[in-house]
Amino acid sequence: MNIFEELKTRGLVFQTTDEQALVKALTEGQVSYYTGYDPTADSLHLGHLVAILTSRRLQLAGHKPYALVGGATGLIGDPSFKDAERSLQTKETVLEWSDKIKGQLSTFLDFENGDNKAELVNNYDWFSQISFIDFLRDVGKYFTVNYMMSKDSVKKRIETGISYTEFAYQIMQGYDFYELNDKHNVTLQIGGSDQWGNMTAGTELLRKKADKTGHVMTVPLITDSTGKKFGKSEGNAVWLDADKTSPYEMYQFWLNVMDDDAVRFLKIFTFLSLDEIAEIETQFNAARHERLAQKTLAREVVTLVHGEEAYKQALNITEQLFAGNIKNLSANELKQGLSNVPNYHVQSIDNHNIVEILVAAKISPSKRQAREDVQNGAIYINGDRVQDLDYQLSNDDKIDDQLTVIRRGKKKYAVLTY
């Protein structure tokens, strides 16, 4: 099975400009290709991972990746299928975000070894050297307004309004392809299916300005089995930066993937062989309650993104919280595992009766209910049941001198911080 066939089997090919010609190029020799990442935030997220891992698969097959950070296009904003104009960021912010994204990409691509080692490029390097007049004369003349307005990504915005700034975005992305082809012989661009219009602007410019053929391959925008856009947890993006989404949170995200999606996601997001995935699928279907596919998915992706130690820690937090063994975890581990739990800041540990704390931390709705909860054995401090109405919090209840975990019943938590 050649690399293109494997990508198709894994569900990673959505659209190509000329599949037959692309397969021929990929099988006849080394292809230089690129994927672009605009710094619209200070971290990449799971939505970017499909293109990143596809790029890595091609590198493992011997082809040469160029990772383009859009220092210039990030200043403009991509209008593709967006309902409204993006907020423009300052140059300083975009530069800072660009550097962070470069660091994240080095986790997945090999920038050091072999003749196909990855290269990092930033389109600010060439766009900052082009005058507006030169850009209009040397690039703009190859694009008709009719051609630009025919793009689905632009059509959606015509009625609501689109600025010239965003309208020109596709020409800038097209020029990226031309520049990389001219300087590095890049002949293939990879990106999300929502980028098709911008990406084919590049092949159009290559054809008209240089009389060359370029290839485009889009990866699908991933949705779950209900049609919901993939990559968000509780409406928030799942970031690749551990400070924005902890390894534990990422682990839980994958662990909670629906059964109907789990095997498909193993093909897309892991480097397990198709034979290994087929074996996992057989075992998974025989005992879905054991969630083998989800556990494998969580292990593989968290290890890939954050490393084996982070995976082991996330697994340990999961197991200890499930067993109620709060004291077996450090304060930092508890902050990961209980990040969505309400916090109540306590100025001083002194003179805090358990009943008062339960009400103040909104664990119990009233003092009467709090007293009943304590007497009925429903209250736990750091995993230990408390049934004494006169119980006073003390320094012994602090974990790593930072926090105390209170639980009511099986699921209602609060974290006291000091």
From Swiss-Prot:
Domain S4 RNA-binding: residue ranges: 352-418
HAMAP family registered for this protein in UniProt: Tyr_tRNA_synth_type1
Locus of motif 'HIGH' region: 39-48
Known role: Catalyzes the attachment of tyrosine to tRNA(Tyr) in a two-step reaction: tyrosine is first activated by ATP to form Tyr-AMP and then transferred to the acceptor end of tRNA(Tyr).
Assigned EC number: 6.1.1.1
GO cellular component assignments: cytosol
Subunit annotation: Homodimer.
Residues noted as binding ATP in the record, renumbered to the chain: 232
The protein's name: Tyrosine--tRNA ligase
Family: Belongs to the class-I aminoacyl-tRNA synthetase family. TyrS type 1 subfamily.
Catalytic activity: tRNA(Tyr) + L-tyrosine + ATP = L-tyrosyl-tRNA(Tyr) + AMP + diphosphate + H(+)
Record-linked SMART domains: S4
Gene: tyrS
